[in-house]
Amino acid sequence: VFLGWSPGTEEEIFTLDELATRFEITEVHKGGAVFDADRLDYLNGVYIRALTDEQLALRLRSFVPDELDDRSLLAVVPLIKERLVRLADASELVAFLVESDAIVAGRYLPDELVPKRATAEETAVALARARDVLAGVAAEDFASAELESRCRTAAEELGWKPGDFFKPMRIALTGRAVSPPLFGSMELLGRERCLARIDAALVKLSREVAPA
């Protein structure tokens, strides 16, 4: 609609009903129209974030793996909504929830777990500490806020910056350097899957630090 037409104001976001009311064919100008794909993506993201979690979950159903049940899909929507530009983006963002532990572990190399300010040996110690923290949380208490509080405390005790401490955890748990919010993701994965994936990462790190 904005290719050749303007509402005469700075407004950019309209519902279809609002456009139908405001649009005038006589105000369409010929020539000079430029299709801005980046702007379209931005507007699409705005519309996505305006949806309720329930509405977005319904729209995402055909874009996410069939293995992700409706309850889990609705639970992950709040974690990914702000990151979505297009509905199709959701598939990659939620894949870690349905991938096997082996597939997740196969997505990264040992050195990808290591923050820039640390060595592989130091990272192994930090990740082992993170595992101990998670193992100390009962399954019924395995919630985002509790996990974040305990992990931040552990990072401080080790003298690690939170971002550095969280990096190997994120990659171990999701197989990716970029993912939905870490602690919400951990809550959805559950205690046992988190522990299993960190164990797999520790095994990979042990090979990295083992003497030749």
What is the predicted function of each stretch?
Residues V1-I48, Q55, I171-L173, A177, ...:
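Alpha-helical recognition segments enriched in aromatics with Gly/Pro capping
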Residues L3-G4, N44-Y47, V64, I80, ...:
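Generic structural signal for hydrophobic core residues of well-folded globular domains
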Residues F14-E18, F23, F35-R39, L51-R59, ...:
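Generic recognition of stable, solvent-exposed alpha-helical segments in well-folded globular domains
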Residues L19-E27, E67, V104-D111, E156-G159, ...:
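Short, mixed-charge aromatic SLiMs
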Residues K30-D36, L68-V76, E156-D164, A177:
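Structural motif
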Residues D53-L158:
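Small-residue-rich helix-loop
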Residues F142-A212:
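Charged substrate- and nucleic-acid-binding regions of tRNA-handling and nucleotidyl-transfer enzymes
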